[in-house]
Amino acid sequence: KEDIQMKTAIVTLPLHTNYGGLLQAYALKTALEDMGHEVTVLDLKDKMPSPKGLKAPFVYANRAMKRLLKGSAGPEVFREKRYRRELPILSAETSGFVDSYIRPRMIDSYEDVKKDEYEAFVVGSDQVWRPRYFSPIENAFLAFTKGWDVKRVAYAASFGTDQLEYEYEQLAECARLLDGFDGVSVRED
């Protein structure tokens, strides 16, 4: 058997209460380890950061306007507050699995990942390319690895919807980043 072991990082959705997402992260990690790779799953410490500084009032006002216009279909205005209140309850059943089997590396942001730490990055699986679930979306296309000599692979990545959730500038930037991938597999046709 050829020695193909690489230090590999998995970039996926936050590991907390999505049972399917947790199982997919575990399965991908296990499959890569079975192939001989040294695998780390990256997980953000603050999974839903609150808007900061001068930007915050505008973010909340924008959400409030959308909520007014769309009713219950609009975004929750202070969703970060509810998230922080409910997360300990919701993750009580999943945190043991995550800690025991996935054993993620907790990071404050993807900028914490240093240039020579990993030889490969795998994005997936699940709805990692959905801006509503992954912010900033450019990091789901490995923007933080720009200029690095690493392998970039998307595995079973999904947009999660047939409605475009990208701003034009995001779409153009993510398409440019995707050109730098060595392999791409997606769920959608």
Segments (PLM) and residue ranges:
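Alpha-helix N-cap/helix-start capping motif
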Residues: 26, 188-189
